[in-house]
């Protein structure tokens, strides 16, 4: 359990805290009003992107680390096999979710950025086969 707790703090807690602080500072900066200007739509989109990225980070990684800690705790307390099997299955389900976080971030930035989203839409239109309508 000590090893699992250390791993959770070093490999999840610390990066999550650093990410949370950095994105939080960015969000605070974006929320500050500029003299003579209202809240621009680009600032709101940036705030939305920050919220989405942090939510996906938490949804992908929190279940994995909690489940892994519960698994090691159950092993330490010599829980019966049925409990260990249930926790092990949940762990195996959450592990790919944790790995998926690395793949999801670039996609999130791709789909939340106007420039890239418009280029992707244009690419999809160009690559889609054109239908000819005949009378």
UniProtKB/Swiss-Prot annotation:
Localization in the cell: Cell membrane
Tissue: Expressed in brain, heart, stria vascularis and vestibular labyrinth.
InterPro entries assigned: GPCR_Rhodpsn, GPCR_Rhodpsn_7TM, P2Y4
Gene3D superfamilies named among the record's database cross-references: Rhodopsin 7-helix transmembrane proteins
GO biological process: transepithelial chloride transport
One annotated GO molecular function: G protein-coupled UTP receptor activity
Extracellular compartment residues: 73-90
Keyword set includes Transmembrane: yes
GO annotation, cellular component aspect: plasma membrane
Protein topology in the membrane: Multi-pass membrane protein
Keyword Cell membrane listed: yes
Topology feature Cytoplasmic, residues: 26-49, 113-135
Transmembrane spans: 1-25, 50-72, 91-112
UniProt keyword terms in alphabetical order: Cell membrane, G-protein coupled receptor, Membrane, Receptor, Transducer, Transmembrane, Transmembrane helix
Family, per entry: Belongs to the G-protein coupled receptor 1 family.
Free-text function comment from the UniProt entry: Receptor for ATP and UTP coupled to G-proteins that activate a phosphatidylinositol-calcium second messenger system. Not activated by UDP.
Protein name, UniProt field: P2Y purinoceptor 4
Source organism per UniProt: Meriones unguiculatus (Mongolian jird)
Lineage of origin: Eukaryota, Metazoa, Chordata, Craniata, Vertebrata
Encoding gene, per UniProt annotation: P2RY4
């Amino acid at each position: 359990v000590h090893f699992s707790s250390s791993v959770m703090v070093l490999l999840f807690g610390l990066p999550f805290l650093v990410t949370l602080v950095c994105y939080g500072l960015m969000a605070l900066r974006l929320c500050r009003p500029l003299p003579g200007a209202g809240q621009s739509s680009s600032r709101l989109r940036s705030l939305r992107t920050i919220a989405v990225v942090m939510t996906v980070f938490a949804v992908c990684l929190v279940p994995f680390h909690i489940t892994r800690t519960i698994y090691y705790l159950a092993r330490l307390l010599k829980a019966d096999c049925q409990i260990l099997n249930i926790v092990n299955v949940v762990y195996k389900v959450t592990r790919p979710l944790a790995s998926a976080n690395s793949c999801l971030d670039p996609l999130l930035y791709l789909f939340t950025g106007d420039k890239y989203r418009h280029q992707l839409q244009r690419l999809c239109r160009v690559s889609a086969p054109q239908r000819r309508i005949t009378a």
